[in-house]
């Protein structure tokens, strides 16, 4: 869009089926514009109004255009349906992603899809950033784990699909990638691989991808509950700069735990006291102020800034209480199977070591995943139920928007597929309108490296040749991706004339047969290997094979 005589701002409006469903965005003043349009209906002729704005925001000129779009892909057809709607929402657009919702999408207040990404995400989907971009969990690379394989490749992406940075995570990622502070380092949930999984937090330098701090939960908690591979199952982490603490939602310990991020000292534990009774950690458990039932296998536990109880001596913690018991049934004989989930708010007096439950709103029973989100500007409380149990008509997900004070349902939508989370689609239209700029070092972090070994250890060429269609091979940049089903390969040997390297996952032993059906592309970095002509051998299903694949590093 070109304006010759002076600089103007631009506002676009995609006309909705109702006035409240209009989607608008503004671009700062300039003499020419690239106008990103978000909010088009799929498979329709969309009316879009473009307006020129002067310095005072007055409309100086306008034009109406029509944009025709393609229909939704089959996987998103009829994926959402309103149960009840007030006709307006605190969110212009709500994004849904992860689990079986492989293509993220956003819907409006009427339950109509207005945006989607035609690229699949990993199991946990994406994570919003303060700059209105997202960290995208990619499907290109997975590292074997003790249970579920974990995605190693993360992208900083905008809503137009432009990738600005790429982060490699050697141990893979799960459940949470969140900024420590706006624009700052990333806190990532990963796995220690030391007989346990989904039990580790890493702080990733935003500029380099290097790990600058970490916490393995078994370093601060040692007790009888370490008896499971997935003993902790951390699903949320966030940072409180005023106290230099992180808040962890530890699902399989039924606990929300606050830890000093520098000293790694436990500050307190929010949990039913009976769970920690008789252990060294019962002294950290907050004392109940009042009579209430605690959470079971919670998700999205966050400390919020809003003072919801009118007491400046307390902090508020919101969470989604799945109220489901899958692990440790023998340890928890007090579980009340209500077959409901709940949006909870706790008020914590840290000085006195007490906790009070100040809000409890029931939702449909969602056994895993899901999210609770308090929206301060509207005073609305969102319940994003990602894995609904026993739903009528086979629906797998449900989202709610409540008035916080009255607990009245303002909007409710059912979804055909399970999802990991749903949240507001926050958009910076000026960022989307800007030409894409890449940092010189836009690939950051590192993967598990092949280790150089003695040449004589692998002098003997394998007697067996692996059938050509058993594995797939693809080199992207300086990374070799080997496609296979989970835990079929334990070693990859790169045999050169002068150098030999081994990529070894032998010690990563699978504990759940379910994931043997998971097809993954194992990322093997090549940039640290010496110049040579290499043959690729593999230990495949405990057999030593020649793949008859070769490559050269010059």
For every predicted segment, state its role.
Residues 7-9, 34, 38, 45, ...:
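Histidine-/acidic-rich catalytic cores in large beta-rich domains
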Residues 1-5:
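Conserved small/polar residues in nucleotide/adenosyl-binding loops
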Residues 9-22:
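Extracellular low-complexity, O-glycosylation-prone stalks/linkers
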Residues 24-31:
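Short beta-strand segments within Ig-like beta-sandwich modules, predominantly Fibronectin type-III
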